[in-house]
Amino acid sequence: MKISKSLWSVMISILFYLTSAPPFVICSSLEVTIDNHSPSNLKTKGSLEQDKLSHQMINSIKLHGILLWVSMGFLMPVGILFIRMANKAHENGIKVKVFFYLHVIFQILAVVLATIGAILSLRTLENSFDNNHQRLGLALYAAMWLQFLTGVFKPSRGSKRRLRWFLLHWILGTIVSIVGIVNIYTGIQAYQKKTSLSRDSSLWTILFTVQVTCLVFFYLYQDKWEHFQKQRVVLDELDHQNNNTNGRNNQSIQVVTRNDHEQKVMVPQPCRKSNALVNLFKLI
């Protein structure tokens, strides 16, 4: 798919703004002017400034987590669901186009939000890359852009490179989506260790687990949707056959009932008195 010049210009302008903008969190200078204040007042002022900085840092961590949650935890998996739904709706050309463009839009939004989250992390947070969350996040960021570029520069249909491109795009997309979800869990754990807010981290873990469960359920459901439709057709045919069989059985039962009725209404034959000896001699 060829990306239009307007789309490229929008993305380049966004990235240029993000890289050239001032930091998201501007820390005030820590210089203290010594005047007639007492040492206790200076200590109180320093502690308040440290608390303010800590509060700003926590807000930056939360914003970073929300951006990456929406990007890799929601938009990217939903975009994968859209492209799979497009493959299922191959008989309807309109649905294929709608699902395909939804896939493209969701993936572009995911890349933009992940880029904002990465820049926020590099400019305002401590990035020593001494833990698994930061290392995995850096690798994911590189893989995500590689995946995006493979989606942009894809070969035309019928090309010899089409199969290799498809395998690369599919494998990268699957890995980035799964590892991105795992890294969100590691990010929640890192947030708990850094801020000691176990209540917030537990709530976020529960909410994210519920969301992932819903996405997995919908993925499995749409994957078996065609099978469910075929099973419903088979069941309808069986019900129709059973109804026809029951109808034929009812007709035969009515015939038998009519014959019995005819036997019942037959003209009775006149009977005569006889004894056992007469019957015995007739048999002999």
Swiss-Prot record:
Protein localization: Membrane
SMART domains for the chain: B561
Residues that, per the record, bind heme b 2: 103, 169
GO molecular function: metal ion binding; transmembrane monodehydroascorbate reductase activity
Superkingdom: Eukaryota
PROSITE patterns: CYTOCHROME_B561
Keywords, ordered alphabetically: Electron transport, Heme, Iron, Membrane, Metal-binding, Signal, Transmembrane, Transmembrane helix, Transport
Cofactor note: Binds 2 heme b groups non-covalently.
Protein name: Cytochrome b561 domain-containing protein At4g18260
